[in-house]
Amino acid sequence: KLGLLNSTIEAQRNLFLDTPPGEEVRKIFIVPVTLNYHFVLEAPDLIDEYLSAKGQDRYLPEQDKYGSWQLIQFLFKFFTKGSNISVSIGNGLDVIGNYVDDHGNSLDAQGRIIDTRDYFVSNGDITVDKQREDEYTRILSQKIVSEYHRINRIFASHMVAFVAFEMWQKKHPKLDLFGLLRLPEEDQVIQYEEFRKTCKRVRKQIYALKEQGKVYHATHLKGNIDLVIRHGLDNVGIFHLKRPLLMNKEGNIITKDFNTL
C-alpha cells in the first residue's frame, strides 16, 4: 500500500513545517509486524482464483467443492482442532526506513544518531518535494519488506509443504505448473526416507539463514527430524477439507490437494 505509506512521509514533513520553533516535533514511527500461522483458511479459494486467471483454458477448476457433507466436516474440524499463531514484531523505523533506538532517535548505517528533519530540507528550509518523497516511500517500503523477511517465523508446516512441492517439481522438470497439478495419483507419492533427508538439508539451511539474521523459525523446528516432520504434517492445512500433505499407510508422503499445496 504505497499510497498509504506515502501519507506517513507527508505527515512527518507537515509536522516539521507546522511545529513552532523551539517546540519538540512529534515523530512518526513504523513498526513491522508479521502474523505467522500454519495455514491460510481461505487459501484454496485464493489459489483457485489465481490458477483460473493464469491458466485460463489450461486449468479446470473443481466443481461443487462445498456440499452439505463438506460443510459438516469443516465445522467438526473447526470446533475440535486447534492451531498456533505467533506474532513477530520487528525493529522500529522512522519514515525514511532508518532504525531507531529505544529513545526514538534515528540511526544511520553506522549506528550514529541523525536528524530526520534533514531529509526534508532544501536550501535551508523544509520544502514539499513530491518526487523526493516518492523516492523515500520506495526506500521505506523496501526496508519494511526486508524486515518482514527477517522477522518471519518459519513453522514445520511451512517447511514440509515447501520440501514436498519442490521435490515433485524436480521429479518432473519437463512439466509446467499446470501439468504438475494434473499428475496422476500414483505419481503423487514421495518415499519417506528421501523426504526426510531433504527436510534435514532444508532445515540446516534455515538455521544458517537465521544465523545471518535473514529469517527466524519456531522453536518446534528444532529436535528430532521425524517429530518435526510429524508436527508439520499434523498442522499443514489442518482445517481444509482435503489435506494438502499427509502420510499414507505405507508411511510415505502424499497429497490429497495438489492445488492447495
Predicted segments with their positions:
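Membrane-interfacial terminal anchoring regions of lipid-handling membrane enzymes
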Residues: 1-261
